[in-house]
């Protein structure tokens, strides 16, 4: 059974293996043992902290095969994007250039560097083993975070954002970076992403142009790549769009990938999930798949189960499922249909 749980210090070697296979652009999952160790330690401190409002906390989860102990995925939530440093994005805007004497009235698409999204909660670090990308476990790895948020709303902001990795070709060339960022740094896209993952995106962002960029002046390839999704990030994009996220007015400052945005209370898994009592018995012989969590904090667990459940009734769990979730008879779980 695959179980989602908080990452632990002992997970570091396997987490680094996952990071090494993650696509370029996932700067929140650097292939660097020291940074990953810091990430896990910060997460452990966040799970242990008493929190009444969102602050500097970050929560890092792993997806584990309970039989073998192998990690096959990971994901994270940052409680407040840009808590310790500005969270930069490019904002899509329209400038109007007009001349009454020439009867000209042109609307021009521009990009403005901003940190409007600072303070929102941020979904990051999504990775799932390639053979699981099209499976229900990709849903568990992504949406399990949302059920954690549903159980602990005081720890998160009223809005959630996620930066989706933008388009780059098989050689790692990003048309958007080549047209914009590379003019300000003597770095190719892969080098820039690695550097930002090992250090900070902020110091690079602060060297980006602070005046609006006129989109029509960019090469066609760069314009066409704006808002486009990297093939390996498509599953993340699709899952979150089904959750009610929208492509807002922002794109990533490095690769031009879309930034998704949603009101926390309107996210499907949060709005439609239910807390129900547990009855332990035989596993149902038929049913539909549900994401199920124990709603706990440091001992948080989430799994996918086929359940025959009706609203207003207890949910029947097998002994194996109850043990995986760490719940007993009469306890409660939070669930939502896949």
Curated annotation (Swiss-Prot):
Catalyzes the transfer of succinyl-CoA to arginine to produce N(2)-succinylarginine. Also acts on L-ornithine. InterPro entries: Acyl_CoA_acyltransferase (IPR016181), Arg/Orn_succinylTfrase_asu (IPR017651), Arg_succinylTrfase_AstA/AruG (IPR007041). Gene3D superfamilies: 2.40.40.20. Heterotetramer of two alpha and two beta subunits. It holds the Pfam family AstA. This is Arginine N-succinyltransferase subunit alpha. One of its GO terms (molecular function) is N-succinylarginine dihydrolase activity. It catalyses: succinyl-CoA + L-arginine = N(2)-succinyl-L-arginine + CoA + H(+). Belongs to the succinylarginine dihydrolase family. Its EC number is 2.3.1.109. Keywords: Acyltransferase, Arginine metabolism, Transferase. One of its GO terms (biological process) is arginine catabolic process. It comes from the Bacteria. Pathway: Amino-acid degradation; L-arginine degradation via AST pathway; L-glutamate and succinate from L-arginine: step 1/5.
């Amino acid at each position: 059974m695959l179980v989602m749980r908080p990452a632990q210090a002992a997970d570091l070697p396997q987490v680094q293996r996952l990071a090494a296979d993650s696509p370029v652009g996932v700067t929140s999952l650097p292939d660097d043992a020291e940074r990953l160790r810091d990430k896990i330690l910060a997460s452990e401190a966040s799970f242990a902290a008493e929190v009444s409002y969102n602050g500097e906390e970050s929560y890092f989860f792993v997806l584990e095969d309970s039989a073998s102990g192998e990690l096959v995925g990971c994901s994270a939530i940052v409680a407040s994007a840009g808590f310790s440093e500005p969270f930069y994005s490019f904002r899509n805007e329209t400038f109007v250039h007009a001349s009454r004497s020439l009867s000209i009235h042109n609307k021009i698409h521009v990009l403005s560097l901003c940190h409007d999204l600072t303070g929102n909660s941020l979904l990051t670090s999504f990775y799932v083993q390639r053979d699981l990308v099209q499976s229900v476990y990709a849903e568990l790895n992504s949406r399990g975070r949302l059920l954690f948020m549903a159980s602990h709303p005081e720890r998160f902001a009223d809005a959630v954002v996620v930066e989706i990795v933008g388009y780059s070709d098989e050689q790692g060339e990003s048309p958007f970076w080549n047209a914009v960022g590379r003019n300000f740094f003597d770095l190719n896209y892969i080098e820039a992403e690695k550097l930002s993952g090992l250090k900070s995106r902020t110091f690079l962002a602060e060297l980006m142009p602070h005046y609006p960029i006129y989109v029509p002046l960019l090469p066609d390839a760069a314009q066409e790549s704006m808002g486009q999704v990297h093939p390996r990030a498509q599953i993340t994009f699709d899952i979150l769009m089904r959750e009610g996220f929208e492509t807002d007015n922002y794109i990533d400052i490095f690769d031009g990938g879309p930034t998704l945005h949603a009101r926390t209370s309107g996210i499907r898994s949060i709005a439609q999930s239910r807390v129900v009592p547990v009855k332990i018995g035989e596993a149902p012989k038929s049913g539909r798949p549900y994401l199920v969590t124990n709603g706990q904090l440091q001992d948080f667990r989430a799994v996918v189960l086929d359940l025959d459940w009706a609203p207003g009734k207890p949910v029947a769990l097998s002994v194996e499922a109850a043990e995986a979730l760490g719940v007993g008879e009469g306890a409660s779980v939070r669930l939502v249909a896949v």
